[in-house]
Amino acid sequence: MDAQPEFEALRHESSSWWHTARRKLLREAVAQAVHGKRDARVMDLGCAAQLDCPQADSVRVLNAHSSLPALAFRQIEGSQNLICTSSEDLGFVSNSFDAIVAGDILQLVPDDRLALRELRRVLKDGGLLCLTVPAYPFLWGEEDEARGHQRRYTATELRRKLNNCGFEISRVSYLVATGFLPSIVARTFKDLFRKSVAPRRISEGGSRLANAAMVSLLDCERHLIRYINLPFGTRVVCWARKPALVAERVTVPAWDRQWSRPPLPQGMTMSQPDLH
């Protein structure tokens, strides 16, 4: 099977306005999370941030995705440390990562609470989770079906789920406010003049001029949300942390269990040390 058409679609999608803006947003979150740290470990879940950065000597990046074609594309584009894994069962030891970024991943997972608990488990104490998800269930459309989405979120719902899964919320904001009203108009128009057609994948690209204009507008929004939370938009972005000093059950190989106390001789207690 020729994978070239699929790779071309992924390459075109990677240069679209939303993917470009999301990439900048997630990279900023990682830069903030690892600032001043040595040998920091970061997971790019969904490979949305493309974090193969110059400071690779101080930041170790793991690119994770559940799709083999997507990982193959990232390998062609030069990404390293690629792994195919599920958001609901990452397969890493607890407390492994200083930061995790997940660009538009949570809405694809059948059990998003299970995925959030798994992300929390592999984060180090105080570690940062930055994620983006599509906003508002009433904006659900053919594109969501074509992309395999399970749901859309409100900021309140996302905040509640993160809190219930043990995260401390730093900030939650809407994003792509400039595209919110056009999305409502388009959604209403499609509802009024719906046709019986199969769902199709809709590109977030468009003309180069429109793409560049949207990138510039979202650059402005990205700088704006440093100071205020936007009240509406077509995406939700959240910064959350795993609370510090939270004990986690860690599975350690038997040969590494140097902390294990050998069993006491029969009849001896902690108050009766062996003096011989």
Question: What are the residue ranges of the model-derived segments?
Answer:
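Conserved N-terminal segment of class I S-adenosyl-L-methionine
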Residues: 1-95, 99-103, 116, 231-236, ...
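Conserved S-adenosyl-L-methionine
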Residues: 167-177
